[in-house]
């Protein structure tokens, strides 16, 4: 096998592995972004734990066929980049939707959420969800609230006991 063919097979396998293991992959048409905007986008995605890769449509189509993602091929027209997120489905959706709002030409094509193809509306809905960190903070707050209430109740009982004992002490001093 020649080197060019080996490189294509390796690239196809890499795309297939990432599409198969990612929680969310978003395909986008990155036309119209200048180098500074593309660098900023890559940095934002990297900080969120998302890999952003420009891919060849033919290799992506081959990888999608091997994974059984038949509905992906019609979206593989024009320049394509894929944002692969292995952990958080909300972060790439938020970041890419923000770029769509700020750019005239950048477009989200389609997404793959845990092996199922999702449209632009579903990706926008994902971007409206709170991030993983926000959800964890709310969950911790939810666990803390009952504990704080219990501490206040117990402290209130102790405080009332101290007030009662103080009142008894003052009463005995007044009698004596």
Curated annotation (Swiss-Prot):
PROSITE patterns named among the record's database cross-references: RIBOSOMAL_L10 (PS01109)
Gene Ontology terms describing biological process: translation
SUPFAM superfamilies with a match to the protein in the record: Ribosomal protein L10-like
Organism whose genome encodes this protein: Moorella thermoacetica (strain ATCC 39073 / JCM 9320)
A GO cellular component entry from the record: large ribosomal subunit
Pfam family, one: Ribosomal_L10
Quaternary structure note: Part of the ribosomal stalk of the 50S ribosomal subunit. The N-terminus interacts with L11 and the large rRNA to form the base of the stalk. The C-terminus forms an elongated spine to which L12 dimers bind in a sequential fashion forming a multimeric L10(L12)X complex.
Database matches in InterPro entries: Ribosomal_uL10, Ribosomal_uL10-like_sf, Ribosomal_uL10_bac, Ribosomal_uL10_bac_type, Ribosomal_uL10_CS_bac
Keyword Ubl conjugation: no
Its job: Forms part of the ribosomal stalk, playing a central role in the interaction of the ribosome with GTP-bound translation factors.
Alphabetical list of NCBIfam families matching this protein: PRK00099.1-1 (NF000955)
Keyword Ribonucleoprotein: yes
Any one GO molecular function term: structural constituent of ribosome
Protein name according to UniProt: Large ribosomal subunit protein uL10
Family, per entry: Belongs to the universal ribosomal protein uL10 family.
Keywords on record: Ribonucleoprotein, Ribosomal protein, RNA-binding, rRNA-binding
Top-level taxon of the source organism: Bacteria
């Amino acid at each position: 096998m020649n080197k060019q063919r080996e490189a294509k097979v390796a690239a196809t396998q890499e795309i297939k592995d990432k599409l198969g293991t990612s929680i969310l992959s978003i395909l986008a048409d990155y036309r119209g972004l200048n180098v500074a905007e593309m660098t900023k986008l890559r940095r934002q995605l990297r900080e969120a734990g998302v890999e952003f890769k420009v891919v060849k449509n033919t290799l992506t189509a081959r990888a999608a066929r091997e994974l059984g993602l038949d509905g992906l091929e019609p979206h593989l027209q024009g320049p394509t980049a894929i944002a692969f997120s292995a952990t958080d489905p909300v972060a790439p959706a938020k970041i890419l939707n923000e770029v769509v709002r700020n750019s005239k030409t950048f477009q989200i094509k389609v997404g793959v959420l845990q092996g199922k193809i999702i449209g632009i509306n579903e990706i926008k809905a994902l971007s409206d969800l709170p991030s993983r960190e926000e959800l964890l903070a709310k969950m911790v707050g939810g666990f803390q609230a009952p504990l704080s209430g219990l501490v206040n109740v117990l402290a209130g009982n102790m405080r009332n006991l101290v007030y009662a004992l103080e009142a008894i002490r003052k009463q005995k001093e007044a009698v004596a």
